[in-house]
Design a protein with these regions (language model features):
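Conserved C-terminal helix/tail region of periplasmic/extracytoplasmic solute-binding proteins
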Residues: 2-3, 7-10, 18, 43, ...
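N-terminal export signals
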Residues: 10, 16-36
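Early extracytoplasmic/lumenal segment of secretory-pathway proteins
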Residues: 46-50, 56-115, 193
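Extracytoplasmic/periplasmic substrate-recognition and gating elements
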Residues: 72-73, 78-80, 181, 264, ...
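Short helix-initiation/N-cap motifs at beta->coil->alpha
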Residues: 84-95, 190-194, 294-308
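Hinge/lid segment of periplasmic solute-binding proteins
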Residues: 113-168, 334-338, 404-405
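Glycine-centered hinge/linker elements that transmit conformational signals in sensory
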Residues: 199-200, 238-296, 340
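Long, aromatic- and glycine/proline-rich binding clefts that accommodate carbohydrate-like moieties
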Residues: 331-338, 385-441, 445
Length: 473
């Protein structure tokens, strides 16, 4: 297994990125991006392993302890981390593709579910041979990580990333708002109708300056968790064959072994499904009756402050929210979390992230050593000392991580996978950027009018998704 990359592969990968940019898959124009050169990437121009993450300089600095620990183990490998500021994952992937097109890609990229198949299809190098070679070293990792997270990074039978962190769309609730409405903690198996009744009770107790349910218009935590709970999605979900080498090698005795595959596929639109209409109609009713907001596009930057000031009753989010609520002044008993409400199923949605080795990496063997080290408990405890996300390792989701910060029922986070093993990743094919645009474009219209408008919006979404899925990734 060599780390060398020949010029032919480098040119193919560069052409791939240029094609993706030219096709508009990212939804922006090259002219609007800052010019990038080799000097923009730490490590480019020397033998350092260059690693790109989404974030700020402070995020890069936060990884220094992990880099120091890695250097002690591998003094022959120099590592430099570049944090790339971006509005969201789509923006981050845009900037990575720009670097590839400029001929100055990083060696390793931290990629979330939203971009996993885009990278696997064209940009990333599979990990199969490395994982097989170092199976003895990797066994402890897989024993500590739920197979659903691993399967999210399988693509056409090969593994492209190891999950480092993840978050499910659970339901956060403000305990003060619940108490004011005379509500107890919801049951683990509460339904979408129970949820609506809870919202109505909070609205009655707080008729003004209060939102019972706040949600955003994006792939994670928007309409998709409701679609999953209703046993559907806006894209038809199928699975690739393959992957037996991984599942039989590391998860042979796992109770969910029979569910595993060579990876998810989303090849066709499904916005015209009756259950998609039913799910949107439910959300339309919440908006119409003043129980929920019209969804805000993006991540909802004002959400933490509103929730912390007791102006929001419930919202879908994952373990990444805990530290932010703590820093906003919420006590450990001021909020709690519960499983997402049950409908026809109680399948949840999650997103995960991990490092991908670029096909153009200068030294793939060195890149693998970084990924292997980063998957260790030592490294993950250095990178995730606070509940800014949910660690992929089950053993790290423990009382110590949430002590003094909450929530009281923190076990919900990992129990989401253990109790609902069909819980699945964000629907993100290689054309994810265009697909997300097609979804977001039609959501607000679908939930803000009458039934006729809803049907028109879903018909528009179906057409937009058909076009999006035809695009070359």
């Amino acid at each position: 297994m060599t780390g060398a990359t020949n010029g032919h592969l480098r040119e193919i990968t560069r052409r791939t990125a240029l094609g993706a940019l030219g096709a508009g898959i990212i939804g922006a124009t090259v002219a609007s991006w800052p010019r990038l050169s080799g000097t923009d990437i730490p490590g480019r121009g020397d033998n350092s392993l260059s690693i790109a993450i989404m974030g700020t300089a402070a995020d890069a600095a936060a990884r220094q302890r992990a880099i120091d620990a890695f250097t002690r183990l591998h003094p022959e490998i120099k590592v430099k981390v570049q944090a790339i500021q971006a509005v969201d994952w789509k923006d981050f992937f845009t900037k990575i593709l720009t670097m590839v097109a400029a001929g100055t890609p990083p060696d390793v990229v931290y990629v979330a579910t939203e971009g996993a198949q885009l990278f696997a299809e064209k940009l990333a190098h599979p990990l199969d041979e490395y994982v097989r070679r170092d199976a003895a070293d990797m066994r402890e990792f897989f024993e500590d990580v739920h197979p659903s997270l691993v399967e999210a990074f399988m693509y056409k039978g090969s593994l492209y990333q190891l999950p480092m962190d993840w978050n499910a769309a659970n339901m956060y609730y403000n305990t003060t708002a619940f108490a004011q409405a005379g509500l107890d903690r919801p049951a683990d198996d509460w339904t979408h109708l129970d949820f609506r009744n809870s919202l109505a009770a909070m609205r009655k107790a707080r008729p003004s300056d209060f939102t019972p349910y706040y949600w955003t218009n994006r792939l994670f935590g928007g309409v998709v968790p409701w679609l999953y709970a209703n046993d559907t999605s806006f894209l038809k979900e199928t699975r690739s064959s393959g992957g037996e080498w991984l599942w039989d090698g590391f998860y042979a005795n796992d109770p969910s072994r029979s569910l595993r595959s060579g990876g998810y596929q989303w090849l066709e639109p499904n916005a015209n499904d009756d259950r998609v209409f039913e799910s949107f109609d439910y959300l339309r009713g919440l908006v119409k009756d003043g129980l929920g907001v019209r969804p805000e596009e993006g991540g909802g930057s004002s959400l933490v402050g509103l929730f912390a000031s007791n102006r929001i009753g419930t919202t879908p989010a994952g373990g990444y929210w805990v530290q932010g609520l703590h820093e906003a002044g919420m006590g450990e008993n001021d909020f709690d979390v519960q499983f997402f409400p049950r409908w026809k199923t109680q399948r949840h949605q999650f997103g995960t992230a991990g490092y991908a080795i670029m096909k153009t990496a200068k030294d793939k063997d060195a890149a693998w050593e970084w990924i292997k080290f980063s998957s260790s408990r030592e490294a993950m405890e250095l990178i995730f000392p606070n509940p800014i996300t949910t660690p992929a390792r089950r053993s790290m989701v423990n009382e110590k991580l949430y002590a003094g910060k909450g929530p009281a029922n923190w076990k919900v986070f990992y129990d989401t996978l253990d109790r609902f093993p069909t819980t699945g990743p964000i629907p993100a094919p290689p054309q994810q950027a265009a697909v997300e645009t097609a979804l977001m474009k039609n959501v607000s219209l679908a939930v803000s009018g009458d039934e006729r408008q809803l049907k028109q919006a879903l018909a528009s979404m179906q057409r937009d998704l058909e076009l999006a899925l035809r695009r070359q990734s």
